[in-house]
Amino acid sequence: MAKTSFFRNKGKNLVLVCAVFLAVFMLFSIFTVGLTYVKMEKRQNIRLSGEDMDAIMYGMTKEQVKKCENSSEVLKIGKVGVAGYAISTQWDDTLHTGLIYSDKTYWDEIKAPARKETKGHYPKQENEVMVTQTALEDCGLSGLGIGDTFTLTYGDDNGTEPKEKTFKICGIWDGYGTKKVFFVSK
């Protein structure tokens, strides 16, 4: 009886099978597009900001840092500080490069997804810097590599006179985000 009913209503059954197929295909497409959108938005944010993070807080107090560290909703806290700004080298005096310090969490976890290439190591000594080719070019130092030294006149916002120091390149990185920076030790 079911067999006879099935063959008698071929048109209806074909429409029903097509409707089920299209519904499954539509659900699959929606979920695929949705998941891809979320992944691509995260990738875009990493490439635009140069970090895998959700928030930035400037000028945090010690109490705010402790509150974030004790919060179960905060997964990681990376600290970054502006150590100064480049004023001149022997080759160029129109620089746009900053001197930045970052802690281990920021460099190893938050900044890592935005880095495409890293040679050498993060600065440990006071006179070491981790550079990008873009920052070296901005300072007129495009031919330098790991182990090379250069003299830089730099300033900070502490109201002191500009200082001159010889830095040694301990690493070179490339990736996304701001590239006109020299990472320095604490």
Model-predicted regions and their roles:
Residues L35-K186:
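Basic-flanked hydrophobic alpha-helices used for secretion and membrane insertion
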Residues A23-G34:
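Alpha-helical transmembrane segments
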Residues M1-F25:
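N-terminal Sec/SRP start-transfer signal
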Residues M1, T32, E164:
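Charged, alpha-helix-enriched surfaces in structured cytosolic catalytic cores
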